[in-house]
Each structure stands twice: as structure tokens, then as C-alpha cells.
């Protein structure tokens, strides 16, 4: 199955800005990989909370629509809240 997530590039980086994003129901994330520069992104929590329940979300390639470009990625790591059904941060790796 193919998944597409709309995202924006983050300009503010750090703990404080990440907390502000989470309070606004956004998820901070990063895309990295060998030979390419890391990209800090942000997307809506509702865009990922439902599709991450599917098992193939973690094993298949995802498409991130990033400012008019489609970037192919795979999920590398995902941090979840300890007891709330919330995703706190996602690490993607270039596919």
C-alpha cells in the first residue's frame, strides 16, 4: 500500500519549538540518509496517527509531499507518548 503525507520544512529547531508544535497537534520529524543533508519537517498529527496502525506502514516506502516535491522515505524510528495515543517524533530515512 502507498502512503502520502503532506509536510512543511521546519525553520525553528530545538526543544521549545518542538513542544510548541506538539501542543498545536503537529509532529516534528527529520529525514536523513547517507550522502544527503538532513531535513527537519513538521506535519499534522491526524495525518499519521491512523495510517501508523497498519503494519505495512513500517516496512513500505512512504511519500512525503514536501513543498512541491515528493520525497521517498522509510520509517526509521518513532517516539510515542508514554500513556497518551500521541506520536511525539518520527525519524525517516531516505529510500
Swiss-Prot record:
Q: What is this protein called?
A: Large ribosomal subunit protein bL25
CDD domains, per database record: Ribosomal_L25_TL5_CTC
UniProt-listed NCBIfam families: PRK05943.1
- What processes in GO biological process is this protein linked to? translation
Q: Which SUPFAM superfamilies match?
A: Ribosomal protein L25-like
Gene name for this UniProt entry: rplY
Q: Which GO terms describe its molecular function?
A: 5S rRNA binding; structural constituent of ribosome
Q: Which UniProt keywords apply?
A: Ribonucleoprotein, Ribosomal protein, RNA-binding, rRNA-binding
Amino acid at each position: 500500500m502507498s502512503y502520502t503525507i503532506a509536510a512543511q520544512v521546519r525553520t525553528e529547531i530545538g526543544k521549545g519549538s518542538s513542544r510548541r508544535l506538539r501542543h498545536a497537534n503537529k509532529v516534528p520529524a527529520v529525514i536523513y540518509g547517507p550522502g544527503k543533508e538532513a531535513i527537519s519537517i513538521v506535519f499534522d498529527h491526524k495525518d499519521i496517527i491512523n495510517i501508523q496502525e497498519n503494519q505495512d506502514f513500517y516496512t513500505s516506502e512512504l511519500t512525503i509531499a514536501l513543498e512541491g516535491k515528493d520525497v521517498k522515505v522509510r520509517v526509521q524510528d518513532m517516539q510515542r507518548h508514554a500513556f497518551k495515543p500521541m506520536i511525539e517524533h518520527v525519524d525517516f530515512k531516505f529510500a
